[in-house]
Amino acid sequence: TKLLLKIKKDNPIAGFENVAFNPRNNLLTVFQDDGLIKVWNIETGKLQYTFIPFEESEYITYTPEGFFTGTEWATKNLVYLVDGLDIIELDQMYDKLYRPDLVAAKLQGKDISAYAKGISLSDIAASGVAPAVNILNKNSTSQSRDIMLDFSVTDKGGGIGSVNITLNGRVIRVSDRSKNSVAQYSWPLSLSRGENTITVSAYNDAEKIESVKSVYKVSWQGKEEKPELYVLAVGINQYRDKSLQLNYAVPDAQAVQKKFSVQNTKLYNAVHIECLFDSDVTKKNISKKFSELSLRIKTDDVFILYVAGHGTVHKDGDYYFIPADFRYKSEDEISLSGVSKTDLTKNLSLINASKSLVILDTCNSGAFISDKGQRGMSEKTAIDRLSRATGHATIVAAGDSQSAMEGYNGHGLFTYVLVEGLNGKADTNKDGFITLTELSNYIDNEVPNLSYEKWGYEQIPQRDLGKQDFPIYAE
């Protein structure tokens, strides 16, 4: 059962119980009889946003353009009814309309119309109906670890765009679009021990609306092998654009490389370290390195991607890593030349490891985003979207140019704390193993404290671990 949100062009005020006016920003809050809370701009007479509270602290906040934020439950259980015709689940439009940063801007009375060009709710609804996906596998158990996943994708009027397969939350395949009205697929999968949850979804041809996910659960009770650890460490000090030069990105990547290579053998059969530094860090070389690693990494293995350099959040709400050969000509150059969320998703989908971690120690250049408050919300939004797109646990430094250039004890602050955590300080239960959650909590506590001591403001790392937690380091 889904709850309905009606989006109409006129947005009339229903009966109300109470109102509140804020003279500082000329916003009128109306508490309606139907439980909705609507906030209006008195100067323009336009609706700013709608807030809907539910039981147990669940909520959704959405703007007239369709941008939304809210709890996971609300996102999965609410649908839009657009102009009385199109019913679309919020979850189907997450990739385009989940924008807590824009909702926050709207809450402050700001105009966000420029961000809605081409991706507003009405534009997305007009792009065509999402296809239907049907997984054909029926067996709930498998005697073999390796299975073939069979499924069909049917065009419902909006065409068939990219197709995504997830295994236990991790994106493992991003396929090309199809011109057939019904497309048949078979894809090999390697299961993990226990129950495996597989989902398949497909976008419409415009890549704006995702289908309802088809879900298949299958159990395999075989024996897993002791994992091997693969680390890809990437760092850029020397950019083609001299204004982007950094001091500690390469030393930081080298420190991570060294730390993981010398750990105890209790956890892994072997440790493999791959590196890309400075001029070697291009979009082409990154993709090539992932392709090479995909031939070696097995399901039971652990994969860690560590990236140090410049990163930014584009106006489309997505994170971009800036490669060494990047030249800043305009904001559009970021989406054209940067390593995008889509690039990262495709690269990470090649990696078979069931346990993985993405660490982005990237600083925001002041040339891209100058408002610190807005930048923090934008970063959180981008990391949420990146982690959902890839299915990989993600931790991001979210530093700025000042801390990146000055450093902390010969390293960037984030990586200094990361290495200190791996040195044993993150091992809260003193069992000799450092888990993903332990390391993340240590970083989350230490980085803000140390940045405040040195620079007078708190650097807040962003993280989205999903439901993953596993030991990544043995002392």
Description of each model-found segment:
Residues 1-16, 34-136:
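Eukaryotic protein-protein interaction scaffolds centered on beta-propeller repeats
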Residues 78-475:
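Cysteine endopeptidase catalytic domains of the caspase/legumain-like
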Residues 24-26:
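Short coil/turn segments that connect the beta-strands within blades of beta-propeller domains
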